[in-house]
């Protein structure tokens, strides 16, 4: 299944890496550099199916976007995967409690990401 994926990451090289990989897998990639860009990307039609979200976006916390998305009924279908260098139990617990559906630590395991995307049932891209 192919998906529309919003990538929110302030590291331009990592954003481009994810974009290239997603497109090579047949997915559509939408890129956002800042938290503000992420808010625009998540609310713009056509809506994404999945958000790959860096947690530390400069001085801002990506979990702010997660909290907002989870309060929006029309975005209930959107899956959010944190992509982060954070890997302590406390960090992972706060990521899960915020409403992320899963978490990938950097550097990302592309096999695990492929399996995750394949497991999702609501594709937008045909």
Label every model-predicted segment.
Residues 58, 88, 107:
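The feature encodes the CheY-like receiver
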Residues 54, 84:
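Active-site residues of response regulator receiver
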Residues 64, 87-104, 115:
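Alpha4 helix (beta4-alpha4-beta5 surface) of REC/receiver domains from two-component response regulators
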Residues 11-15:
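Short acidic/polar segment at the start of the alpha1 helix of CheY-like receiver
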Residues 31-50:
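Acidic, metal-coordinating helix/loop segments flanking the phosphotransfer/catalytic sites
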Residues 63-76:
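Short amphipathic alpha-helix used as the core "switch/output" element in two-component signaling
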Residues 108-117:
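C-terminal output helix
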Residues 16-24:
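Charged docking surfaces used in two-component/phosphorelay signaling
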């Amino acid at each position: 299944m192919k998906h529309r994926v919003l990538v929110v990451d302030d590291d331009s090289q990592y954003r481009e890496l994810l974009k290239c990989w997603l497109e090579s897998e047949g997915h559509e990639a939408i890129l956002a550099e800042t938290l503000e860009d992420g808010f625009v990307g998540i609310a713009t039609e056509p809506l994404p199916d999945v958000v790959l979200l860096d947690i530390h976006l400069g001085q801002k916390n990506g979990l702010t976007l997660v909290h907002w998305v989870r309060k929006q009924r029309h975005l209930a279908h959107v899956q959010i995967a944190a992509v982060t260098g954070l890997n302590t139990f406390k960090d992972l617990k706060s990521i899960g409690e915020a409403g992320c559906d899963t978490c990938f630590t950097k550097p990302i395991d592309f096999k695990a990401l492929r399996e995750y995307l394949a497991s999702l049932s609501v594709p937008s891209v045909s």
